Amino acid sequence: MKKNKIIYWIATGLMSAIFLFSASMYLFNYEQVSGFFINLGFPTWLIYPLAILKILGIVAVLTKKSKFLKELAYAGFLFDPILALVAHLVVSDGEHMAAVLAILFTITSWFFDRKVFGDYTQTYLPTK
């Protein structure tokens, strides 16, 4: 159990670091990031909402206050780098390694979250 917990926290820490770095780049280096977005063919209005959602996702995963929000954050943390990976491969700019690492850390974190904290089911609608 202790080994699983260590793996979980390392993977979650690395996943959080990647997405926090990405969000900080989006917020503090807007001009540079907007150039990347234009090069990849994405609209630049996505930059600030993505940064905010990445930060909120990290909070949802680390606090575990809502199982639904945590699962939603994990889904977003998987979709974002998958789409980034595809975009980088299509453009052939060679900048795809961070996306691959984010995918690996996200899957590892999600898998070991289930092992350490239990596989749970949540009722999304109130039951009577």
Q: Positions of the model-derived regions?
A:
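Core segments of alpha-helical transmembrane spans in multipass integral membrane proteins
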Residues: 17, 21-24, 42-62, 76
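Extended, low-polarity transmembrane helix blocks
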Residues: 1-22, 62-128
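Membrane-interface helix termini and inter-helical loops of multi-pass transporters
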Residues: 30-40
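Short, surface-exposed linear patches
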Residues: 41-42, 48-49, 82, 106-107
